[in-house]
């Protein structure tokens, strides 16, 4: 008999990510990651899939993390990043003929994101360096916990990292033969998305070089001469661009981004830069699809940055697109022809194109199965290549969600899913939980979601939708929430409850719960201040006061302007009107507040304000603080805390529903 899923089962789920074909196509490297329950951490190792035998073998071992496998141009060496010898991750290379991996760097600040030069003689890595720090340092100077920290820029802290202390991501070239290092960038800016030109003479990267520490400023793409260091700006200095790659013939640059016409609600588009003519063209102006991964899940560890992959003839490239609850692979020609190569009810988070260009190898997650590797031949059916989660799927009862769609009063179509309890007995009724995603510009979709499975196993139905503001349904839809927080988005999620009850007569309309995190936490707070329809609520990493959020969040100083469309100093009352804290006196729903103590995106003072207000008024509430947890607790937090979080949620609903 199959077992019901529990919170602890996150320790049994394996993540299979970042597939990379070898240049000859005979094998592919990928990363397998899993919770290390004993150490309350994560373990990642590099595996190799052999295309001839269909089998996989591990190439790294141990309880640390080895990630980012990248083949040398001749396919004889594999580079990767690992923290196997200490806390700081370093660059290693391994021969395909066997033997021990060779460590190439020993930088106390760690390195990331390896990228081979076309001649195979060097590897580019990213290193975060603060003021006074160097790639030549052999020891990391420990920060004096009593030393004052001077702050002069707006972006002085970052969720998951804390105080930045003037550290920026720099690009460093490492010699494969000698290990000698050369720092290629030194601007006071984070440099990302690097790529070499085919001849190895140029390097493209993205950065905010405005000389102001303000994350809201334009993020541009630059081409650097590796001989002289001269820079050429590619993009128009009025948007956010990155994820660039050179065409094989060296003439074009494919890149993704937008001109922020709708601020951070703008769809990511595909662009082509003609290097010979110095002309930048948007290839997908008429495509109403977000060309990036915006799908939310909680079972994938790691993942990969997916940049455009060119065809050998330099006539087009492949990218990921977010559409209607799925992520798929899109082909875009240099003439602007666009069509999906694969768009099924699944979550593709990373892929690699075979050298013969006949098929992809992709990391795919489905609603009833955590991630695996699949072969996706052009125009043919997919084939599952790994069985990392076979045992988990075989031994557990997994609830299959039903797709729902409904029209709102103003004629907007809203999409979502209804997941029923894992076990249903006769005519027994069961409670319903409304789950609201964060962002707000993200998307629920066709993926395995452990939190929902845990609740379904406990006897709850779960309804989760993509309200206005979500990605996946076009530019007008994703932009609709801006300036209307708690408006039509509130109507959308409340109607989702009505639709679920209408579809399933077993749902008890008197036993309703609501939960959500980040923007979903804001909506949970907003809902319990507007209606007493729900009998229990759990708000996570939430927002309660937009006025204070403006100054305490790492993105608050521009997020409130962009999203609420109210100026902090000119429209203070309007920000207060949209703050759930204003309506705390209306709350009658028992409210559990979950928050990470090191959340710099939605700082814990947001939870504290709400908790104190409710407690002072005699409302039923509880605050649970997670030490050292960032905004990403539910996805990448310490495993033990992730398990406790899920148990807190289900226990609160068990108690009140």
Curated annotation (Swiss-Prot):
| Positions annotated as active site in the UniProt record | 518 (charge relay system), 631 (charge relay system)
Q: Does the keyword Chaperone apply?
A: no
UniProt keywords (A-Z) are:
Hydrolase, Protease, Serine protease
Q: Keyword Protease, does the record have it?
A: yes
SUPFAM superfamilies noted in UniProt? alpha/beta-Hydrolases, DPP6 N-terminal domain-like
Which InterPro entries does the record cross-reference, listed alphabetically? Answer: 6-blade_b-propeller_TolB-like, AB_hydrolase_fold, PD40, Peptidase_S9_cat
User: In the record, what terms sit under GO molecular function?
Assistant: serine-type endopeptidase activity
List GO BP terms, alphabetically.
Answer: proteolysis
What Gene3D superfamilies does the entry give? alpha/beta hydrolase, TolB, C-terminal domain
**Top-level taxon of origin:** Bacteria
User: Which family does the UniProt entry place this protein in?
Assistant: Belongs to the peptidase S9C family.
What is this protein's name?
Uncharacterized peptidase YuxL
Organism, scientific name = Bacillus subtilis (strain 168)
Per UniProt, what is the name of the gene that codes for the protein in this document?
yuxL
């Amino acid at each position: 008999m199959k077992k019901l899923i529990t919170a602890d089962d996150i320790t049994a789920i394996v993540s299979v990510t970042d597939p990379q074909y070898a240049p000859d196509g005979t094998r592919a490297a990928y990363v397998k990651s899993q919770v290390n329950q004993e150490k309350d951490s994560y373990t990642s190792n590099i595996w190799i899939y052999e295309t001839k035998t269909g089998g996989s073998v591990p190439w790294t071992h141990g309880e640390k993390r080895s990630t980012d496998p990248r083949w040398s141009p001749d396919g004889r060496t594999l580079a990767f990043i690992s923290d196997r010898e200490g806390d700081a991750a370093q660059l290693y290379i391994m021969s395909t003929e066997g033997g021990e991996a060779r460590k190439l760097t020993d930088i106390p600040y760690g390195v990331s994101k390896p990228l081979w030069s076309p001649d195979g003689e060097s590897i580019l890595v990213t290193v975060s360096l603060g003021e006074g720090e160097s790639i030549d340092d052999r020891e990391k100077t420990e920060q004096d916990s009593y030393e004052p920290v001077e702050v002069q820029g707006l972006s002085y802290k970052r969720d998951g990292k804390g105080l930045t202390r003037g550290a920026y991501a720099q690009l460093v070239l490492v010699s494969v033969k000698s290990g000698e290092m050369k720092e290629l960038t030194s601007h006071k800016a984070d440099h990302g998305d690097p790529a070499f030109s085919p001849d190895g003479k140029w390097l493209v990267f993205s950065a905010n070089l405005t000389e102001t520490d303000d994350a809201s400023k334009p993020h541009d793409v630059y081409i650097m001469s590796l001989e002289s260091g001269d820079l050429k700006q590619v993009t128009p200095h009025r948007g956010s661009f990155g994820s660039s790659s050179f065409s094989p013939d060296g003439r074009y640059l494919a890149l993704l981004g937008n001109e922020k016409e709708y601020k951070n609600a703008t769809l990511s588009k595909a662009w082509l830069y003609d290097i010979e003519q110095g002309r930048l063209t948007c290839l997908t102006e008429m495509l109403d699809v977000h060309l990036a991964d915006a799908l939310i899940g909680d079972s994938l560890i790691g993942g990969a940055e997916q940049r455009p992959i060119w065809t050998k003839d330099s006539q087009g490239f492949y990218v990921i697109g977010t559409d209607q609850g799925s992520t798929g692979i899109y082909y875009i020609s240099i003439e602007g022809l666009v069509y999906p190569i694969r768009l099924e009810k699944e979550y593709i988070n990373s892929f690699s194109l075979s050298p013969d260009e006949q098929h992809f190898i992709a990391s795919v997650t489905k609603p009833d199965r955590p991630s695996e590797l699949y072969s996706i031949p052009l125009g043919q059916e997919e084939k599952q290549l790994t069985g990392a989660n076979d045992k988990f799927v075989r031994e557990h009862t997994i609830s299959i969600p039903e797709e729902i769609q409904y029209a709102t009063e103003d004629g907007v179509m809203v999409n979502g899913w209804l997941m029923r309890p894992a076990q249903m007995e006769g005519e027994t009724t069961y409670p319903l939980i409304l789950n609201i995603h964060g962002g707000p510009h993200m998307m629920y979709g066709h993926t395995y979601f452990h939190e929902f499975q845990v609740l379904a196993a406990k006897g709850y139905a779960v309804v989760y939708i993509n309200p206005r503001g979500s990605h996946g349904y076009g530019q007008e839809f994703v932009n609709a929430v801006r300036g209307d927080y708690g408006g039509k988005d509130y109507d959308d999620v409340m109607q989702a409850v009505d639709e679920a009850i209408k579809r399933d007569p077993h749902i008890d309309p008197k036993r309703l719960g609501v939960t959500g995190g980040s923007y979903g936490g804001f909506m949970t707070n907003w809902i319990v201040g507007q209606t007493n329809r729900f009998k229990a609520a759990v708000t996570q990493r939430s927002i309660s006061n937009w006025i204070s959020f403006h100054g305490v969040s790492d993105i608050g100083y521009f997020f409130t302007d962009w999203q609420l469309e109210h100026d902090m100093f000119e429209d203070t009352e309007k920000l207060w009107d949209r703050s759930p804290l204003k309506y705390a006196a209306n709350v009658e729903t028992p409210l559990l507040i979950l928050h990470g103590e090191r959340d710099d995106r939605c700082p814990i003072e947001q939870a504290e304000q709400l908790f104190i207000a409710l407690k002072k008024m005699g409302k039923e509430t509880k605050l649970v603080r997670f030490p050292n947890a960032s905004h990403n607790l539910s996805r990448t937090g310490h495993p033990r805390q992730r398990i406790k979080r899920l148990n807190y949620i289900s226990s609160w609903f068990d108690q009140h529903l």
